[in-house]
């Protein structure tokens, strides 16, 4: 089963993503901080990460840079409520950028595309 790591400091977002993505057949692990995500990367590596940009403590961009230093092969989807970041995601070495929405269809499609692109589907 494909394992996804969702990193978001908002509990309701983590719960929504966990519920909806589990329904899609994924094994979903959620954490609330970049630091927790980096720990999971070492102890229970995912197949893909959905990473919020604005996090308490270390932000999502610094977390992404650390992830890329360790696991360049790991697909990462940046996820934020702010569409203004969309133009910058490629320069940050993320695979995709999805604006947060109650409708998760774009996120679900992007997850499939990123996994297929990286040969992990």
Model-identified regions with their sequence ranges:
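Short hydrophobic/Thr-rich beta-strand motif most characteristic of the beta2 strand and flanking loop
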Residues: 25-32, 40
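C-terminal output helix
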Residues: 102-115, 119
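Acidic catalytic/metal-coordinating carboxylates
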Residues: 33, 59-62
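Active-site residues of response regulator receiver
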Residues: 52
